[in-house]
Structures are given as structure tokens and as C-alpha cells.
């Protein structure tokens, strides 16, 4: 009997919607919540275990199943749960993928099943109201210390602002929603709730690093920023549908890591730098947590004269790392050295993705304004 029940549960995985994790979309889920009636992956099952008042989990393959539990799974399933628990997810709300950090997945799961934010829209006020203020820990630009700072997000002004003192009349910085991006970077920032916010200042990218001790708070900030971007883009591109706008709300970096670089004459020694590939901007920093990039390189499309090559030009000297990459732009060549072959492969793939993609009209404007820094 036990074997038959387990086989019955396994057969339910073949039903439409059940072949991927109900929460992050990972293929071939091996776990199930027998109180919610959903099939989930191993990673998400760990989060479900932390909300036992809502969800109780079992291994599809290894645990014993009772008849009533099998029947419950059969009468529910991922599609039914989605129809109930995700019926009112705002278009701008970030839905995590298998590669996202633990925090995003945990808050998505808690929002769905524990707080039921997508059944009762009034619970979405913290990120849907168009205005948000509160205190966040912000990393100091020069000393690297995290200090509590007041942040204000106002859609009416199209800006995120922060203040150095509680009683300050003027903000220390005003970040325009138009050019703002936010991406979770727990490992780099050294905090599980670490968020990196970038914006353009004088056409150069400025980084700020923030976190909040409460996971819900920082994810609410993240989704409030996405909501502000969504509403800004709806006005800027009135003909565009949600499907066109949602991918533009926030970007994860295509690739980050250390490479060596040399200057424009290619006679100087190579220096180790931290590189971030953000859409078509390749930025390099002395330290991963620097506020400003030392330089930025725009990577356009092959139609505009950009090429990526494996290796160095002949007679290149001064690099400590053996695996070379050459980026050819209409102005000059940029040389980079990677420590490992797999690093080189990943960087070339990231660059190639940008080069193979035709440029949008607004990207030509960015290219024209771009400062090619040595």
C-alpha cells in the first residue's frame, strides 16, 4: 500500500503545472507541501519548513504518504494553488527564479502563503502606495561603515532620496527613478539582506549599498522601487504592454568578478580590477564595494563595429593571468586577462550576448554620451 501511495504521488508530477517548483519554477520538484497541495524543489522546501503553521512538507520519493494526503495533493496541485495564492500579484512584483538569493525566495513564499498578500490587495500597501520612507543601513562611501540613514521614495517626484541627518532639510542624494536599478548582492555586501542600488550621476554610475535587518522590509523596498519604475515607464512608453515593461524594472548583472586590465597604450602593466557587466556597461572598480567605477566601457552591437575575441594581440606583455580577452570597439581595443579558462568562457559569453543583440534607439544615445575612460 505504501508503495502504491508513493507511486500515486509520483504520477501527480506528470500533471500540467506540477513538473516545476510552484514557487521558483525549478524543474523536477522532489518535495511537496501536503497542507498547501503544491510540489516544490529542495531549496524552497527548506523555506516551507520555517512556516510550519502554514506548510508541512514531505519528500515525494522517500517519505511515507497517507491516503488522505495523496487525495489532497490530487485535488489541489500547483495550478490550483497559483490560481488562489497568486490571483492578485501586481505586475511589478518580483517573482524569484531558481538562481535568486534565499531572501527573495523566502519573502515570496511568506507573502504568498503566510501573509496572503496576493489574495488581499490591501496588504500590498507597503510597496504599492507610491510613497515610502524609513531607515536603512547604508555603507559609507569612504570609510566602509554602515550607518542608519533615512530614505524616502516618492513616485510623485520620480526619485529615491536619502538624508545624512534625521533633521536635514536637504537630501544628501537624489536618485532619479528613470536611471535607477536595484539588485540583491548578499555575498558582495556581506549581509543576507544586502541590496545594491545604482543610479546615474553626471552620466557615470554611482553605487550605494544598503540593507535592513528585517527581510520583509528590504524586499518591500525592492518592490516599491520596481513599482516606481513601472509607473514611470508606463508614462514614458504609453503604448507598451506590461510584458514589455516588466523586464526593464530591475536588472541582475550579466557577470561580475576579477580580471586584469591594461591602459589604452597597452604598454602599461596589467592591474587586477573588479568588473561588473550591467546590460551594455562594463564597469571596473578597484574594490567591489567602491561607490564609483574607475572606468566604464560601452559594449555595442556587431553592426556598430564591436567584436569580442579570445586571447591577446601578438606581443602583449605584462599580464599575470594567462587567459586573454580582446574587445574591439570603434575607438580602440580593450585587453583583459582572466585567471581561469572557465572565467574567460563566462566573460566572453556575457560580452557576446551584448554584441549579438541589435542596439535600441536609446542605446545609440547612451553610446554617443558615453565617456570612454582610460
Curated annotation (Swiss-Prot):
InterPro entries membership: Arf-GAP_dual-PH_domain, ARFGAP/RecO, ArfGAP_dom, ArfGAP_dom_sf, PH-like_dom_sf, PH1_ADAP, PH2_ADAP, PH_domain
Keywords: Acetylation, Cytoplasm, GTPase activation, Metal-binding, Nucleus, Phosphoprotein, Repeat, Zinc, Zinc-finger
Transmembrane stretches, start-end: none
Record note on what altering residue 21 to A does: Loss of GTPase-activating activity
GO cellular component: cytoplasm; cytosol; intracellular membrane-bounded organelle; nucleus; plasma membrane
SUPFAM superfamilies: ArfGap/RecO-like zinc finger, PH domain-like
CDD domains reported in the protein's UniProt record: ArfGap_ADAP1 (cd08843), PH1_ADAP (cd13252), PH2_ADAP (cd01251)
Taxonomy, superkingdom: Eukaryota
Modified residues (N6-acetyllysine): 272
Residue numbers bearing the Phosphothreonine modification: 276
Principal location: nucleus
UniProt PTM comment: Phosphorylated by PRKCA, PRKCI, PRKCZ and PRKD1 in vitro.
Entry-linked Gene3D superfamilies: Arf GTPase activating protein (1.10.220.150), Pleckstrin-homology domain (PH domain)/Phosphotyrosine-binding domain (PTB) (2.30.29.30)
Residue numbers of Phosphoserine PTMs: 87
Tissue expression: Expressed at highest levels in brain and at lower levels in peripheral blood leukocytes.
Biological process terms in GO annotation: cell surface receptor signaling pathway; regulation of GTPase activity
Zinc fingers typed C4-type, residue spans: 21-44
Residue span, Arf-GAP domain: 7-126
Segments forming domain PH: 129-230, 252-356
Annotated GO MF terms: GTPase activator activity; inositol 1,3,4,5 tetrakisphosphate binding; phosphatidylinositol bisphosphate binding; phosphatidylinositol-3,4,5-trisphosphate binding; zinc ion binding
Function: GTPase-activating protein for the ADP ribosylation factor family. Binds phosphatidylinositol 3,4,5-trisphosphate (PtdInsP3) and inositol 1,3,4,5-tetrakisphosphate (InsP4). Regulates the incorporation of CD63 and CD9 into multivesicular bodies.
Binding partners and assembly: Interacts with PRKCA, PRKCI and PRKCZ. Interacts with the N-terminal region of PRKD1.
Name the UniProt record assigns to this protein: Arf-GAP with dual PH domain-containing protein 1
Species this protein is from: Homo sapiens (Human)
